[in-house]
UniProtKB/Swiss-Prot annotation:
Alphabetical keyword list: Membrane, Mitochondrion, Mitochondrion inner membrane, Transit peptide, Transmembrane, Transmembrane helix, Ubl conjugation
GO biological process: mitochondrial electron transport, cytochrome c to oxygen
Subcellular location: Mitochondrion inner membrane
Topological region Mitochondrial intermembrane: 61-69
Primary site of residence: mitochondrion
Record-linked Pfam families: COX8
Transmembrane segment boundaries: 37-60
Protein name: Cytochrome c oxidase subunit 8A, mitochondrial
Quaternary structure, from the entry: Component of the cytochrome c oxidase (complex IV, CIV), a multisubunit enzyme composed of 14 subunits. The complex is composed of a catalytic core of 3 subunits MT-CO1, MT-CO2 and MT-CO3, encoded in the mitochondrial DNA, and 11 supernumerary subunits COX4I, COX5A, COX5B, COX6A, COX6B, COX6C, COX7A, COX7B, COX7C, COX8 and NDUFA4, which are encoded in the nuclear genome.
Originating organism: Saimiri sciureus
Family, per entry: Belongs to the cytochrome c oxidase VIII family.
């Protein structure tokens, strides 16, 4: 790297720092219908299966992964 590299990089990023960043206008309304108990149970169960089942599989087979590697 040359001596001028930091100066060139500072020149490139300096102009980007002065640009205004537009803020998003996000508005939300109350839900039209409340969720029922069954819908909540299905949602929580699907999240549980999606995230915790693969992690549990990996943790339960960790010894076999260690022996293989």
């Amino acid at each position: 790297m040359s001596v001028l590299t930091p100066l060139l990089l500072r020149g490139l990023t300096g102009s980007a720092r002065r640009l205004p960043v537009p803020r998003a206008q996000v508005h939300s309304m109350p839900p039209e219908q409340k969720l029922g108990v069954l819908e909540l149970a299905i949602g929580f169960t699907s999240c549980l299966v999606t995230f915790l089942l693969p992690a549990g599989w990996i943790l339960s087979h960790l010894d076999s992964y260690k022996k293989r590697g």
